[in-house]
Each structure stands twice: as structure tokens, then as C-alpha cells.
Curated annotation (Swiss-Prot):
Listed name of the protein: DNA repair protein RecO
Role: Involved in DNA repair and RecF pathway recombination. Involved in pilin antigenic variation.
Keywords, in A-Z order: DNA damage, DNA recombination, DNA repair
HAMAP family (UniProt xref): RecO (MF_00201)
Keyword Cytoplasm belongs to the record: no
Amino acid sequence: MSEHRVNHEPVFLLASSPWRESSLRVEAFSRRYGRVALLARSARKRQSELRGVLVPFVLVSASWYGSQELKTLHRAEWIGGWPQPQGRALFSGLYVNELMLKLTVREDPLPELYDALAEVMEAVCCKAAYIDDLRRFEWRLLNLLGVAPDLNRDGDGGTIAAGGTYLVRPETAVFPVGKGFAVPPHAAGVVAPGQSLIDLREGSFRTAESLQQALKITRLFIRHLLPEGLKSRQVLEQIRQFDRKETARETVPTSDGTASNAV
């Protein structure tokens, strides 16, 4: 079997883990080759040219060779384009990478998904408010994976109406329901206004309600695909709980009975 070589391919690094004594095993996503597994030999050595280059969230130019599933990375250069995310944005970047790692298969080219990944990474790294971008990315990912329902027409063949109410469930079409309809306990589903579905389809969230409904819907499908959950989301939730406890501890009553921050 001939040895396949790829040179100077822009990639996003999704994850890396130690390999033997001094190497790294890297999962990367490229526009032309999809997700690829790369072995970066001696990358953990202090004198390695790869040290400090193999970082997530920004573009890296990678060159590799090999005919097996695990390729050998022989060159990498930092392309950059934006700074590394900080604070909560860091967890959002990790969340996006974890979705890509768990929901894509190796060597399945998805150019549109690569473009969506580039857009959301730039937003997370550069914008103060990027929640809209996360919801757009999640929905594009679900669409490109073929698991998102059609939001142009409902299961009865009718056009999604802005004033209607619809039941959204995994693995089935969207169906119209009455405004008082409630999802049965322990059943997976979201009841959403038609306008929210239109906004999600178009990627333009006109109201806070539409953005909240988008979160419920994308989370519904992601939980269906990944029932074991996401580590990045669990860690962020733990931080949020810690922050809430700290806020409650630092807030003490004043002499007039109102609350005041003690710090």
C-alpha cells in the first residue's frame, strides 16, 4: 500500500494525549480530510519544534504521512488568527471540541462543518457575547450529521407557522400541537413556538425566548446522541455551582435587613 502524504493542511486540534514516553497522540479536524488521528513523535520533549505549536482553538498548518488510521505528523506551524480563549470562553471552546470529537467519525470530509468550526472558534475567542454563535454551530452540526429535523415543514406537510406551537423530538418530524400541550414525564421532547423554530432554522435569534428555545432543542438532540454527557459541560456546571455558593457566602444581611456583598 502506498504511503499517503498531506502537506500544509490547515487543521483545528480537538484533543491530545500522551503517547509513550515523549510523544503525543493528536485528534485534528481538517477541511479536506475530516477528523484525523496524528502521532506527534517526541512532541513533549523540551527541544521539540512541535512543543508549543500543537494548541487547540486556533488554526495550525499540519503535514503528515501514513496509510494506517494513525498517521505520523512530521511538521506543524502555528497559523493563528486570533488569541486563545480566556475564562468561561475557554470552557466553551472545550465544549465545541468535545462535540466534534464525540460526534464525528474519522476521515469523513465535511467541508461545511470545518467552516462552521472555524466560525464558532473565532467567535468564542474574539467576541464578548458569543452564545448565538454556539447555538448556530450546534444546529449546523446536527444538520450536517443528518439528525436534525426539517424546520421548513412539519410532519403533516404544513409549513412551520410563526404563530403555531410544535413538539420537537429526536428521530421524528416536528408536529403541531395545542398551546397547552405538555411533554409527558420522562419523555424526551420540547414544545416550542413556531417563531423560535424559524429563528433556529435561520440562525437569527430575535428574542431571548428564541435563544432559550434553541438551547433546549440543541441540548435535547445532543443528550439523545450522547447520553453519557459531556465532561466540559459537567466541569462548567461545577464551577457555576461553586460561584453560586461563594456569592451566597459573601452576601450578608445589613442592619436594615437588606443584603450586601461582604467583599
